[in-house]
Amino acid sequence: SKKALENDKNVIIEKPITANSKELEDLIETANKKNLMIFEAMNLHYTPAFLSLKEDLKKLGDIKIVSFNYSQYSSRYNTFKEGNILPAFDFHKAGGALMDLNVYNIHALIDLFGKY
């Protein structure tokens, strides 16, 4: 992403946008200096179902507890069990369940209920 920005390209980035906030700040600074755009590719927030959910939640009143779960079996899991840690499972490379799947939950929760 940084190389694309440095070469005067607008960038759409697949999740996770970066591994940490420092990296994100660096990308934003580079984009701003060059008057370029960076976008995170997650589009859930713009689907009709999500927009409807967001409106319907307002009718329920004060929400006390929310539980989100998103899981799936990975076609790479057998490789992982054999000891070969691919990037999707390597937290040193912004992988692992939190960054690979649960980032969807976090994005949705923040959009629906705000930051606390």
Where does each model-flagged region fall?
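Predominantly a Rossmann-like dinucleotide-binding segment in NAD(P)-dependent oxidoreductases
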Residues: H45-Y116
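Beta-strand-loop-alpha-helix segment that lines the small-molecule cofactor/substrate pocket
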Residues: S1-H45
